[in-house]
Regions:
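Conserved beta-strands of PAS-like sensory domains
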Residues: 174-199
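Amphipathic alpha-helical bundle/coiled-coil segments
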Residues: 39, 148-152, 181, 197
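Extracytoplasmic/secreted envelope proteins and their assembly/folding machinery
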Residues: 28, 46, 95-99, 152-155, ...
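Juxtamembrane extracytoplasmic/periplasmic/luminal helical "stalk" adjacent to the first N-terminal
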Residues: 3-88
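Extracellular/periplasmic ligand-sensing ectodomains of membrane signal-transduction proteins
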Residues: 81-88, 101-163, 168-175
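Solvent-exposed, extracytoplasmic
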Residues: 94-103, 193, 197-199
Length: 199
């Protein structure tokens, strides 16, 4: 009897240790995989921000030629708002960059581009929008006021401190996401921020 009790105890302890090791290993693998996906999303957003930053630099240094700068064009996102050719071309570039990034990167649920007051154009205090994975082909969501995006940590911290921001994971719908914001700089100052939610 005592022998059976000892064998049962040894079996239970050994089984428990094996199960614990197996579960720990599986959870570590899942965490490593998820971490890799999140890092991939961050890298994609960094590339998008650097592409926008590079375009702004080329635009304002004259490397991107602007025909008809005196002609104002209607904003695609803000109906009734007239944009200079430079601002219009920048709008087209950032909208397509955001759309394509969301459509081609499954781990990115949302991507937005927001500018500091009067940085897209000298008579526009606010300019910000975001694209979601679900509506990338059909609609773009705009912010009507600077305050609408300026208070969000993913904008406020990169804009104010000049470095990327990563939130703690939070529940969004049926999954966990991480918010990420990275500054767009020109001439040594922050002119805007690219933000995203990474699955």
């Amino acid at each position: 009897m005592v022998v059976f009790a000892v064998l049962i105890t040894i079996t239970v302890v050994t089984s428990r240790a094996s199960i614990y090791t197996g579960i720990s290993g599986e959870l570590a693998s899942i965490a490593e995989f998820n971490g890799g996906e999140i890092q991939s999303g961050f890298d994609t957003v960094e590339r998008a921000a650097l592409g926008i930053q590079d375009y702004i630099g080329r635009l304002y240094s004259g490397q991107v030629t602007e025909e008809g700068d005196a002609d104002l064009q209607q904003s695609t996102l803000y109906p009734g708002r007239a944009l200079t050719s430079a601002a219009y071309n920048l709008e087209q570039f950032v909208v397509e960059t955001a759309r394509n990034t969301v459509k081609n990167t499954p781990e990115i649920k949302m991507l937005g581009v927001m500018f500091e007051p009067y940085q897209l154009q000298s008579d526009m205090e606010e300019y910000g929008f975001y694209v979601t994975m679900d509506t990338a082909d059909t609609s773009i969501h705009i912010y009507d006021a600077y305050e609408g995006y300026a208070k969000e940590d993913s904008y406020r911290i990169p804009a104010g401190e000049g470095h990327p921001y990563i939130s703690q994971p939070y529940q969004d719908g049926d999954g966990m996401v991480v918010a990420y914001g990275t500054p767009i700089t020109y001439g040594g100052r922050v002119v805007g921020v690219v933000i995203t939610s990474v699955d």
